[in-house]
Amino acid sequence: KTWRQVDGVPRDVPINTIAQDPQRPDRVFVGTKQALFMTHDGGETWSRRGGNLPFGDFTAILINPRNGDEVFAGNAYQTTDVGGGVFRSTDGGTTWARIDPKGRRLPSQRIWALAFDAHDQNVLFVGSHSAGVYVVPRMSDTLSSTQ
């Protein structure tokens, strides 16, 4: 076998993270320094995801192993009003909503890691750049610190 570079994902920006849907292996998400991309056909074609996602540094992607339509994306691009934070899609990555809305945002919106609790899939761990680890119930927008 030989290596083959895919078309449709920028080649001139860092690739931060890649996640594959465990139920639909042809569906893959790629987080770059500028945007989030997705393929439905195993990498033959790619599309840039929008749907309320900000510009920026996508550093973490988490797909619900029991429901591939639920996807979380962590963004590390932080400015005063836009970017950074945790975003959730319930339609396979077409539309997105913040799970840390304004007024209740993480102390650091620079998100670096996401994980489900191995004992409770309703709990999400959020690792930040400089403010520790936070826990959020998956269906909630209330974050609590584990520090």
Predicted regions and their residues:
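Extracellular glycan-interacting surfaces
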Residues: K1-Q147
